[in-house]
Regions:
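Asp-based, Mg2+/Mn2+-dependent phosphohydrolase catalytic module
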Residues: 2-31, 123-126, 139-140, 144-242
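Conserved SAM-binding loop
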Residues: 41, 135, 190-191
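Residue-level detector of anion-binding/catalytic polar loops
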Residues: 62, 131, 207
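Residue-level marker of regulatory loop/turn positions in helix-turn-helix DNA-binding domains and
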Residues: 114, 135, 166
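Hydrophobic beta-strand core positions in alpha/beta domains
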Residues: 133-134, 210
Length: 242
């Protein structure tokens, strides 16, 4: 789903910025990889902004950038409850979830694509027999509706936020992904684009790579302070020959 930025007291503010080191990502020393979807392997921020603006305009509520910043790691249900409370809406959160799903599905079906360089990296992992998984707060219904991304082909192993007890503010989803891949979290590298998720992946014991999302929700310096590695563009990874 969407993205959230939460300033955490555990954020390593004094840590040096993670190096932009695409060469560290191939050959991959870790036994497995875990990928976020929205903002990391797919640029969907503009789709959610379109949904948010239309949703708020329908209720005569001005759009502000802090609204999407509070939603995505919450997941759909918790995000809908937050929206009802924030704007004092006399609406059922379940109805809001259905509205978001309907609006976003129409956009994801035709507009969502993988970032340039992602498929080449996934193919390299497959050829090298390195297992990997998708770990996302998005929903199966939404991702499986996409016409331009074959989610099952590219991500046969998937963990959805609704399958674990807590949001990406906690390490649950990364621990579950590692379990499904048959490795320890410490043997995984996690690719994420926002601070809260990177912190949680660290807490799970994973190596982390912050991916440049190119959207206003990302604080580049913050994610580089948290992550072990920084990736500006998937096409920068020097795959060469396997």
């Amino acid at each position: 789903m969407r993205k959230v930025i939460i300033v955490s007291s555990s954020s390593p503010d004094k840590k040096a910025l993670a190096p932009a080191a695409p060469e560290r990502l191939w050959p991959l020393p870790e036994k497995a990889a875990i990928f976020d979807f929205d903002g990391t392997v797919s640029d969907t921020a503009y789709l959610w902004e379109e949904v948010d603006r239309a949703f708020l305009a329908k209720r005569a509520i001005p759009y502000t950038v802090d609204f999407p910043r509070q939603l995505s790691a919450l997941g759909f249900a918790e995000g809908a409850r937050y929206t009802v409370e924030r704007y004092h809406l006399d609406e059922d959160p379940d109805d809001i979830v259905e509205e978001w799903m309907r609006m976003s599905r129409a956009l994801y079906i035709t507009k969502a694509v993988l970032r340039p360089g992602v498929t080449e990296y996934l193919e390299a992992l497959q050829r090298a027999h390195i297992p990997y998984a998708l770990a996302t707060t998005n929903t199966p219904d939404l991702l499986e509706s996409m016409h331009r991304i074959d989610i099952q082909k590219w991500f046969p192993v998937k963990v959805y936020g609704q399958e674990v007890a807590r949001s990406k503010a906690f390490p649950d989803i990364y621990e579950e992904a590692a379990k499904r891949l048959g490795v320890a979290p410490s043997d995984c590298i996690v690719f994420e684009d926002l601070a809260e998720a990177l912190l949680s992946a660290h807490r799970a014991g994973c190596t982390t790579c912050a991916v440049c999302s190119g959207d206003a929700l990302q604080d580049t310096n913050e994610v580089r302070r948290i992550a072990d590695i920084y990736l500006e563009d998937w096409r920068d990874i020097p795959l060469g020959t396997d």
